[in-house]
Amino acid sequence: MLIDKFGRPVTNLRISLTKECNLNCFYCHREGQQDGERTMTPEEIERIVRIASRLGIRNVKLTGGEPTVRPDIYEIIQRIRPYVVDLSMTTNGTTLYASAEKLKEAGLDRVNISLDTLDRKKYKMITGYDVLDQVLKGIRRATNLFYPVKLNMVVMRGINDDEIWDMIRFAGEVNAILQLIEIEVPREMENSQFFKDFFYPLKPLEEKFEKIAVEIRERKMHRRRKYFLPVDGKMVEVEVVRSMHNTTFCMNCTRLRLTADGYLKTCLLRKDDLIDILGPIRRGATDDELVKIFKRAVQLRKPYWIN
């Protein structure tokens, strides 16, 4: 197992398959990626995952952009499936109604679906597209095939902060887990107008959850809290993701990232941490040389928010 200088094990790999997306959400952080021309092939992705698995990284999440815009998404899943214990994907859900069964057959274990609002006009304002009904159909299809299904709601002040309880009820209705997520920006953007306008702190909401939850659990990843809330006769699982200035969150991060253009990246918010792995692969690097690249990336890891 790989362990960084801060004693944090690295067990998860988050792979961006593409920077392309069929939506245009105004707050998107693009997985912290910069512009790049290279695209990893299914064979190259498989090799990187195989090396990662050899080093004890056996939990993989596929992201984008929107990963399902890649026509070879099913091949990618099939290729990496043998090397991982848990294979999940974050998606905007626009293609799920048509693709969920094929994704399951290819070997995908579970999905996280971005859903910031249940209001059609708001959805179009946030994403640029009027496809909410299509996404909701995809969510219902997914909950019949995958378990668990998580709904990711980025809570934004003045936009959807009035829908939190509606979203909790919807999650209960479709038997999904709801993740409430604070907007996350690097230090240099904390004084930006964007952050001032839209950041909605979730700590007060967590304090309310603590009073009404039937059960509270804590995940190893980031020490996130999960609240089991009785709502409309159902037990709804709600997870709160608060990363801004959260040193506990950072000290319990077990994740390494792989950008769509083939760089290992240690932190979403950092810009000085890219380690090229695709270039060496294309220049004929051996497996042992790729192992050294992984180890070098892990030794670069450091908590972004730290006392």
From Swiss-Prot:
Co-factor requirement: [4Fe-4S] cluster
Name the residues that bind S-adenosyl-L-methionine: Y27, G65, S114, M189
- What SUPFAM superfamilies would the database entry show? Radical SAM enzymes (SSF102114)
Q: Which reaction does it catalyse?
A: GTP + AH2 + S-adenosyl-L-methionine = (8S)-3',8-cyclo-7,8-dihydroguanosine 5'-triphosphate + 5'-deoxyadenosine + L-methionine + A + H(+)
This entry's comment on the bound cofactor is: Binds 2 [4Fe-4S] clusters. Binds 1 [4Fe-4S] cluster coordinated with 3 cysteines and an exchangeable S-adenosyl-L-methionine and 1 [4Fe-4S] cluster coordinated with 3 cysteines and the GTP-derived substrate.
One GO term (biological process): Mo-molybdopterin cofactor biosynthetic process
- What residues does [4Fe-4S] cluster 2 bind to? C250, C253, C267
EC category name = lyase
Where would you find the membrane-spanning parts of this chain? Answer: none
Is the keyword Magnesium assigned to this protein?
no
Keyword set, alphabetical order: 4Fe-4S, GTP-binding, Iron, Iron-sulfur, Lyase, Metal-binding, Molybdenum cofactor biosynthesis, Nucleotide-binding, S-adenosyl-L-methionine
The record's annotation in InterPro entries points to: Aldolase_TIM, Elp3/MiaA/NifB-like_rSAM, MoaA_arc, MoaA_NifB_PqqE_Fe-S-bd_CS, MoaA_twitch, MoCo_biosynth_MoaA/MoaC, rSAM
What protein is this chain from?
Answer: Probable GTP 3',8-cyclase
Q: Which species is the source of this protein?
A: Pyrococcus furiosus (strain ATCC 43587 / DSM 3638 / JCM 8422 / Vc1)
Lineage start: Archaea, Methanobacteriati, Methanobacteriota, Thermococci, Thermococcales
